[in-house]
Amino acid sequence: MNRETTCCFTGHRPEKLPWREDEGDPRCLELKARLAGAVEAAYEKGMRHFLCGMARGADFYCCEAALALRERRPGVTVEAVIPCEEQAARWRERDRERWFSLVERCDNETML
């Protein structure tokens, strides 16, 4: 991993966000659009490897933005940074399914 071209993400869980679980809320949609713009700007500045925390909420949004960037731009890799093997074990089924889908789509995963 080259630190000069690596960008890391982590953020708030849904409980700390004003819209909580409602990803259709205009504020959430605005945040996701801004994240997509920030990821694109990072790419323009030379970032190619994106490390994503894999918690619910903003971590998921960032991972999804990085994966979308990878579809549009060459040379992008996305790595899931997982704090422990059982991270998603106690989550609701839909959150676990989203987590597994994101991890599967990432190029690499690192267990801390």
Tell me the role of every PLM-derived stretch.
Residues 1-112:
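Acidic/glycine-enriched connector segments
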